């Protein structure tokens, strides 16, 4: 409720706000006639049931104890169930060895690593290197380049495939120079 404050009120201007609030007159409930006449219509009596605190605490404590012990049992059971048919991350049944021939989950042969670059099969027996002469998946010997075989099919007589274009260009220039030598300009 807003009330104009006069400037002559010294207590409001000089002292703190808490003293001003304490001096303010509060209106009682009796001043509102509407509330007094219809009090029974809007206000309901509040009844509290007496509940003993001891029984609630004992119920809560026993409930907490049983739930935590049950949770621990189920967690340990889940761990046991997870490890029943496997050993570790390999994905092979427990009791078998690597040499039994089980592949890893990625599909590469056992004994190979991801860094070796094997996806399913390397194209040569395991334990051999590229230098051993086994052909890689496209069917050509290791170290060969596709471009060399393509350049060889173009028909340039040069043995050096890297300089085939400049050689052909220089041949054309030499033939033009030779014709001018045979027929000097007069």
From Swiss-Prot:
Residues 78-92 have a biased composition (Basic residues). Residues 60-69, 94-107 have a biased composition (Polar residues). Pfam families: DUF5568 (PF17724). Residues 60-140 are annotated as: Disordered. It comes from the Eukaryota. InterPro entries: DUF5568. Belongs to the UPF0461 family. This is UPF0461 protein C5orf24 homolog.
């Amino acid at each position: 409720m807003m009330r104009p404050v006069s400037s002559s009120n010294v207590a409001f201007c000089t002292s703190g706000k808490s003293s001003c609030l304490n001096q303010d007159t509060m209106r009682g409930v009796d001043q509102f006639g509407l509330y007094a006449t219809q009090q029974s219509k809007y206000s309901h009596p509040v009844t509290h049931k007496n509940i003993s605190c001891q029984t609630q605490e004992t119920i809560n404590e026993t409930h907490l104890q049983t739930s935590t012990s049950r949770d621990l049992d189920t967690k340990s059971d889940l761990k046991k169930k997870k490890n029943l048919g496997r050993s570790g991350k390999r994905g092979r049944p427990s009791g078998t060895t690597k040499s039994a021939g089980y592949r890893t989950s990625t599909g590469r042969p056992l004994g190979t690593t991801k860094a070796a670059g094997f996806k399913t099969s390397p194209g040569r027996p395991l334990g051999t290197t590229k230098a051993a002469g086994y052909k890689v998946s496209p069917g050509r010997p290791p170290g060969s380049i596709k471009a060399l075989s393509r350049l060889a099919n173009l028909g340039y007589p040069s043995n050096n495939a890297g300089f085939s274009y400049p050689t052909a260009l220089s041949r054309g220039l030499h033939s033009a120079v030779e014709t001018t030598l045979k027929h000097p300009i007069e």
